Swiss-Prot record:
Residues noted as binding Mg(2+) 1 in the record, renumbered to the chain: S92, E226
Encoding gene per record: trpD
Protein name per its UniProtKB record: Anthranilate phosphoribosyltransferase
Binding site for Mg(2+) 2: D225, E226
Residues engaged in binding anthranilate 1: G80, N111
Organism field: Caldanaerobacter subterraneus subsp. tengcongensis (strain DSM 15242 / JCM 11007 / NBRC 100824 / MB4) (Thermoanaerobacter tengcongensis)
UniProt pathway annotation: Amino-acid biosynthesis; L-tryptophan biosynthesis; L-tryptophan from chorismate: step 2/5
EC number in record: 2.4.2.18
Single GO molecular function: anthranilate phosphoribosyltransferase activity
Cofactor(s) listed in the protein's UniProt record: Mg(2+)
Length: 339
């Protein structure tokens, strides 16, 4: 199936959803050689991935993942595709912690760095979390403390053969898109940053096909896979079975423009320190971008009616110290239940 798929893709022909599902199934079964998988990934990158292809791949990965069943009505994820070249600190990881302090339940799905210096797993480990906690512990963390981390290799075990190929290619591939689309938890809301402006609407279409109730798929005018504060941001919102495309500007929320260099991160240790400083109330451009993205998480989490309310709530959580308290609670709870 892989060879046939590559032949189609080389001719710039799209796979349908069923074909894509079968191709991913073959990869996960371990039958795909590194050269075939690499050829498929590069071919898709050059052609451009279709909605049907991404949906089929995502459904196959979800069906073959270790499922995390939760006793919670509404759970969200906050993540980006990566591959934007922005080299920012781990914004969505900070957002997940703050959103949980507001009462939103967050199943943060992520991995170690592949095409960046610091993935969500890297920075969470530096913050003191056991990123390889068994699913039963992560389930308790989400249900009791509002946030847990789902380390992708623990849940997508069949993908272990793909990671070395991704690292060797050293460029973004369809797997940058699939990571955020294959959360093993039953999430219903999502803030998803993408590396290309032309992906916001197609990825919103995929989310609809995957059963997401409310989402914001975002891409900054500056290229970031976040809601940026250096410029406006493109948004494709999923709400009540429809997709709405619009642009938001940080100035609309009384957040000043920042400079790209103000948002840069470094390695996991430095990024962890940045997150701690923000949670402790430090002000500045880094806090501003976290606040705006937290507002989006609170909105897709159905805790606020709009982003303006979300910004106000995020500011209160940081100013009051509640966000930092929640971070310590989550960390302490994980250590207690695992020990």
């Amino acid at each position: 199936m892989l060879q046939e798929a590559i032949k189609k893709i080389v001719l710039k022909e799209n796979l349908d959803e069923k074909e894509a599902y079968e191709v991913m199934g073959e990869i996960m079964s371990g039958n795909g050689t590194p050269s075939l998988i690499g050829g498929l990934l590069i071919g898709l990158r050059l052609k451009g991935e279709s909605v049907e292809e991404i949906t089929g791949f995502a459904k196959a990965m979800r069906d073959n993942a270790v499922k995390l069943q939760l006793d919670a009505d509404y759970v969200i994820d906050t993540c980006g595709t990566g591959g934007d070249g922005g080299k920012t600190f781990n914004i969505s990881t900070a957002v997940a912690i703050i959103a949980s302090a507001a009462g939103v339940k967050v199943a943060k799905h992520g991995n170690r760095a592949v095409s960046s210096k610091s993935g969500s797993a890297d920075v969470l480990r530096e913050l003191g979390f056991n990123i390889e906690a068994e699913p039963m512990y992560t389930k308790k963390m989400i249900e009791e403390k509002g946030m847990g981390f789902l380390f992708a290799p623990l849940y997508h075990r069949a993908m272990k053969n793909v990671l070395p190929i991704r690292r060797e290619l050293g460029t973004r591939t369809v797997f940058n898109l699939l990571g955020p689309l294959t959360n093993p938890a039953p999430i219903k809301g999502q803030v998803l940053g993408v590396y290309d402006r032309n992906l916001t609407h197609p990825i919103a279409e995929v989310l609809l096909k995957l059963g997401i109730e409310r989402a914001m798929v975002v891409h900054g005018f500056d290229g970031l896979d976040e809601i940026t504060t250096t410029a406006p941001t493109y948004v494709s919102e999923v709400k009540e079975g429809e997709i709405f495309d619009y642009v938001i500007d940080p100035l609309d929320f009384d957040i000043p423009y920042s400079k790209p260099e103000d948002l840069k991160g470094k390695g996991p240790r430095e990024n962890a320190e940045i997150i701690i400083d923000i949670l402790k109330g430090q002000k500045g451009p880094r806090r501003d971008i976290v606040v705006l993205n937290t507002a989006a998480a609170l909105y897709v989490g159905k805790l606020v009616e709009n982003l303006k309310e979300g910004v106000e709530l995020a500011e209160r959580l940081l100013n009051s110290g509640l966000a930092y308290e929640r971070f310590l609670e989550i960390l302490g709870y994980q250590r207690r239940i695992i020990s």
